[in-house]
C-alpha cells in the first residue's frame, strides 16, 4: 500500500515538474526585417581639398548598387564590395603639374536612386619664383618663339635634297627679314644632306650644297635671328635613307658604320660653322624611327639606346672641332621626337653642359595634321574636350622632369593645318588652338618653333604662314601669327593661360 502510494506521489511530482517546465514556451526571436534599399546615394564626404602632389582618400557610399562615377581623366575610382547597401570607394587624384588650381565634381549614380556629388579642389603646382630662374629657363627665353623653314633645304627628290623640289621658292634675305618683322625670335632651318654626301670613309659633303646652307644661315644671322641647324630627312622612314635606325638596331656592325658617317658629316658641318657666334645652335637629328614604326611596339629601350648612342657621337664630333663649337648650344631628340619616349632619352655626356632636349608636338593628331581635320578642339568644342588639360599636363610634366632640374627643353615643331576662314567656327578654333599651345609653352618655359612648310590654302598639310621667298604673310596667316606672338610676348597680369582658356570660342 505504502509502495503504491509512493509510486503515485512520484508520478504526480514528475507530472507537476513537466507541467511547470513546459507550460510556457519562450517566444522565438523575430526574423530581422532587412533595411530598405536607399532611394538616394549618400556620401561620407561631399568636398575634398587635395595638394598639388595628388593623393588618395576613401569615401563611404550608401547606395542600392555599386555606383557609376562620372569624373575627369585626372581622377580614378576603385570600388570595394557592396555590403548592406554600403561600399567604400577609393578616390585617387593625379598630381597637378599646372600652375593653376583645378576643380572637379564627381557624380555618383545608381539605378533607381538620386545621385550624389563630390567636389574635389586641387592646388596648383608651385611656380618658380623669379629668384629661382635657372639656366634652362634663361635659354628658353633666348630662343623664345621660333619658326621653321620647312620643306625647303630638307626637301628631297629621288634621294637627293633640293631646295625647290617641293614647290617652295628659294629663300632670300627678305625671307628672314619678314620672319623677324612678324615677331619671331628664332628660326629652325631643317636640312637634308643626303644626295650630297660622298663615299666612305670621308663622306665628303659637296661644297655647293654646304655653301648654300651657309648662305641661308647667313640670311638669318643678318636678320638678327637665332638659328637651329640640323640633319633632317636623312632619317629613314622605310625609304632606305642613310640614318637607318632599323638596320642599326638589328645589326651591330651596321650601327658602327652609320655612327662613322654621323661623325664624319657632323664634323664637316661643325667645321664649316665653327666661327659663327652663339646665335647658331646645332641639332643632331629630326624624327628617327624604327622602320615605319611611329609608335615603337617592342624592344623600345633597345631602339632608343641606339638613338642615345648616335646623339653621343654627334656631341663628341661637334665638340672636337673646337672654336665656338666647344661651347655652342646643341639639341638632341629622342625616338620620333615624341614626348612619349623622352623617358628613354639619355642626355649625352657634354663637357660644355650645353645640350638641350628636343621634342615635337602635334597633339591631338586628328585635329592638327591628321586626315580627319576635326572642326574644333578643347573644352568648348565637341572634340577633345580635355584637350587643354592634356597640353598642360604634357608641358607641366616636361617642366618638372627637366626644366626645373636645369635641363633645357625646346619644342622644335608644333602647329596645326590651316582652316578655311570662311568657316567661322573652324577658323576661331584654329586660332584658339595656336594661342593656347603657344601660351602654355611660354608658361612652362619651353621655347616653341612653329612648323611652316610653305603650303598655301586650308586643309591637311597646309602650314604656310610666311612666304619662303618674300617673307610676306601667306593668305590669312597674319591673324594666326599675331595670335602666336601675342601669346608669347604679352606678359601682362590680365593675360594668362587661364584667361586664354576662358576666352575659348563657343561651339
List the predicted regions and their residue ranges:
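Bacterial Sec-dependent N-terminal signal peptides
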Residues: 18-44, 117-131
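Solvent-exposed, low-complexity, repeat-rich "mucin-like" stalks and linkers
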Residues: 39-69
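A short beta-strand micro-motif common to beta-rich folds, especially ectodomain repeats
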Residues: 89, 99-112
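Aromatic-rich peripheral "rim/lid" segments of glycoside hydrolase catalytic domains that contact
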Residues: 421-507
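Surface-exposed binding patches on compact interaction domains or structured appendages
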Residues: 43, 62-90
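An active-site-proximal structural segment forming one wall of the substrate-binding cleft
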Residues: 167-187, 202-233, 237-284, 306-322
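N-terminal carbohydrate-binding accessory modules
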Residues: 126-186
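Active-site region of glycoside hydrolase catalytic domains
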Residues: 256-387, 396-417, 443-446
Amino acid at each position: 500500500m505504502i509502495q503504491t502510494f509512493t509510486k503515485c506521489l512520484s508520478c504526480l511530482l514528475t507530472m507537476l515538474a513537466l507541467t511547470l517546465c513546459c507550460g510556457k514556451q519562450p517566444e522565438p526571436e523575430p526574423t530581422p526585417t532587412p533595411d530598405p534599399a536607399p532611394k538616394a546615394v549618400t556620401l561620407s564626404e561631399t568636398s575634398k581639398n587635395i595638394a598639388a602632389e595628388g593623393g588618395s582618400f576613401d569615401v563611404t557610399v550608401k547606395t542600392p548598387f555599386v555606383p557609376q562615377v562620372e569624373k575627369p581623366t585626372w581622377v580614378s575610382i576603385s570600388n570595394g564590395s557592396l555590403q548592406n547597401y554600403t561600399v567604400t570607394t577609393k578616390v585617387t587624384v593625379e598630381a597637378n603639374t599646372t600652375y593653376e588650381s583645378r576643380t572637379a565634381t564627381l557624380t555618383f549614380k545608381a539605378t533607381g536612386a538620386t545621385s550624389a556629388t563630390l567636389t574635389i579642389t586641387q592646388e596648383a603646382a608651385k611656380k618658380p619664383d623669379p629668384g629661382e630662374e635657372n639656366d634652362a629657363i634663361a635659354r628658353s627665353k633666348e630662343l623664345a618663339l621660333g619658326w621653321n623653314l620647312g620643306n625647303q633645304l630638307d626637301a628631297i627628290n629621288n634621294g637627293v635634297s633640293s631646295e625647290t623640289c617641293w614647290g617652295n621658292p628659294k629663300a632670300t634675305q627678305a625671307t628672314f627679314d619678314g620672319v623677324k618683322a612678324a615677331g619671331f625670335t628664332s628660326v629652325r632651318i631643317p636640312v637634308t644632306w643626303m644626295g650630297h654626301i660622298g663615299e666612305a670613309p670621308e663622306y665628303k659633303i659637296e661644297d655647293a650644297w654646304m655653301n648654300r646652307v651657309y648662305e641661308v644661315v647667313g640670311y638669318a644671322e643678318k636678320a638678327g635671328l637665332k638659328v637651329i641647324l640640323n640633319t633632317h630627312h636623312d632619317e629613314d622612314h622605310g625609304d632606305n635613307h642613310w640614318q637607318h635606325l632599323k638596320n642599326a638596331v638589328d645589326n651591330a656592325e651596321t650601327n658602327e658604320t652609320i655612327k662613322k658617317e654621323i661623325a664624319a658629316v657632323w664634323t664637316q658641318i661643325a667645321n664649316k660653322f665653327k666661327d659663327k657666334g652663339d646665335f647658331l645652335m646645332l641639332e643632331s637629328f629630326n624624327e628617327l624611327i624604327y622602320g615605319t614604326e611611329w609608335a615603337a611596339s617592342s624592344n623600345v629601350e633597345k631602339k632608343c639606346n641606339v638613338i642615345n648612342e648616335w646623339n653621343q657621337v654627334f656631341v663628341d664630333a661637334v665638340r672636337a672641332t673646337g672654336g665656338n663649337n666647344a661651347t655652342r648650344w646643341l639639341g638632341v631628340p629622342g625616338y620620333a621626337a615624341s614626348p612619349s619616349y623622352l623617358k628613354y632619352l639619355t642626355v649625352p655626356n657634354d663637357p660644355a653642359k650645353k645640350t638641350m632636349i628636343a621634342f615635337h608636338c602635334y597633339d591631338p593628331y586628328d585635329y592638327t595634321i591628321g586626315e580627319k581635320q576635326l572642326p574644333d578642339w578643347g573644352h568648348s568644342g565637341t572634340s577633345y574636350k580635355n584637350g587643354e588639360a592634356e597640353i598642360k599636363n604634357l608641358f607641366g610634366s616636361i617642366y618638372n622632369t627637366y626644366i626645373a632640374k636645369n635641363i633645357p627643353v625646346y619644342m622644335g615643331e608644333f602647329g596645326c593645318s590651316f582652316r578655311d576662314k570662311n568657316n567661322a567656327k573652324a577658323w576661331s578654333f584654329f586660332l584658339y588652338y595656336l594661342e593656347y599651345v603657344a601660351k602654355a609653352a611660354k608658361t612652362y618655359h619651353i621655347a616653341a618653333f612653329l612648323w611652316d612648310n610653305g603650303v598655301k590654302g586650308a586643309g591637311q598639310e597646309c602650314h604656310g604662314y610666311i612666304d619662303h621667298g618674300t617673307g610676306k604673310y601667306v593668305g590669312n596667316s597674319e591673324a594666326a601669327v599675331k595670335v602666336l606672338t601675342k601669346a608669347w610676348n604679352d606678359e601682362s597680369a590680365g593675360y594668362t593661360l587661364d584667361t586664354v582658356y576662358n576666352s575659348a570660342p563657343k561651339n
